[in-house]
Amino acid sequence: MTTHNDDAAAALPQDENKIIAERRAKLSALREQGIAFPNDFRPQHKAADLHEKYDGKTREELEAEPVTVTLAGRMMLKREAGKKAAFATLQDASGAKADGRIQIYATLDLTGEAAMAALHHYDLGDILGVVGTLFKTKTDELTIKVTELRLLTKSLRPLPDKFHGLADQETKYRQRYVDLIMNEDTRRTFKARTAAISSIRRFMAENDFMEVETPMLHTIPGGAAAKPFVTHHNALDMEMFLRIAPELYLKRLVVGGFDRVFEINRNFRNEGVSIRHNPEFTMMEFYAAYTDYKWLMDFTEAVIRQAAIDAHGTATLTYGGRELDLAKPFHRLTIVGAINKYAPQYTNEQLHDAEFIKAELKKFGVKPHAHSGLGALQLALFEETAEAQLWEPTYIIDYPVEVSPLARASDTVAGITERFELFMVGREIANGFSELNDAEDQAARFQAQVAAKDAGDEEAMYYDADYIRALEYGMPPTGGCGIGIDRLMMIITDSPNIRDVLLFPHLRRED
């Protein structure tokens, strides 16, 4: 049956204060009756479950075996047929991938005079509790024939017009609660996010990984090349940092004998905001003793593929109107190999000429650090010429030592580490490597990072003496990887902006 919004939902901004005042008056009347916010209604059913179970029933079957239901939800639509009958649509949070909505039908005869009179004064956005029996309308829509109707929560603010929604994108992010009420796609996105993260946790548990929690406040920022947020611990009178990565703590646990550990939690980096970056973001990092970066690539591929299947129903996704197949084996290229493939104008000789690469980077507006060697320059050129073209899942492998201070050096190629980064749809999704477990080598690399920081590199790492001490007790050969959960969710849910997959993204203060 066709239903429509009422005037309150289509309110113009200048009418909003008037509508709020009218609703407050209704709430005042409820307070006087002592029934403003009851908390004794217990729903027993969900809209999506009722549709799944009874949509296939005929009108005759529902009449022959009446089904009594008790349900609560927010009233999203209402259509009155005089004083004797009214249809409304209630919305609850049910449904694996979307919302649950179900129509209700109230009549003077069945619902009662007092409840019907009250219904006429209910507004869209009000939360109602209903008891009734299921039936099907002439248009075969599953509907609850109401025998008991109660107002559970009075909504004071009018909902946006359903045809126009929230006024702009920033308002959607700032008032996510309204966006979730109005937008089925938003609800579907965050249900998919939950499904994907639950899938990852199951996959890790099935592969004998132990989930752990490590500190969010660090005395030394480490585990990644990034600028930290700085805070002060009053009781200890010391400077502390919101963590940029949990890596060094997780590897301490491997030293302690936990061979397989993982953590899904927040990291914080005091850097720019963009459609791909948020200062607070979710990462999964995992470490497995007696593995290397080749094992990690296979395992990471399997984790991501299963998460996509569990959240999306298939490993074949669509992003921005273009297909992305996660079912196929992921590609593997070196940094120079990727440049050769996606920027074939460069010769092999040019790609091994540091001065030539510096000149090319200048054309892109990139000024490398004075201490940058050939490997770092090649990586910078890759980022400018090839990275954005890596649509299909691709591992870029064998990163230079100078940009990989925590990775194990290659046994066969000087200056190269056993490290990879995973890219898809032109953005980095994961970073992993065979871990450096040589305490003396790690100490030397930390010293090189300190020198780089002294030379002006704000993202260079600090020297972590306690981590070196941990390595001196002996860490088994280990592989470790970090997966950017938010960016992965963007791809799985076909979301163009990282804010679309964060329930409450960071925004500037409201005026």
Curated annotation (Swiss-Prot):
Residues noted as binding Mg(2+) 1 in the record, renumbered to the chain: E421, E428
A Gene Ontology cellular-component term: cytosol
EC number(s) on file: 6.1.1.6
Compartment(s) where it occurs, according to its Swiss-Prot or TrEMBL record: Cytoplasm
GO molecular function, one term: ATP binding
Keyword Cytoplasm belongs to the record: yes
CC cofactor: Mg(2+)
Superkingdom per UniProt: Bacteria
Broad class of where this protein is predominantly found: cytoplasm
Entry's cofactor comment: Binds 3 Mg(2+) ions per subunit.
Family of this protein: Belongs to the class-II aminoacyl-tRNA synthetase family.
Subunit comment: Homodimer.
Name the record gives this protein: Lysine--tRNA ligase
Protein's organism: Janthinobacterium sp. (strain Marseille) (Minibacterium massiliensis)
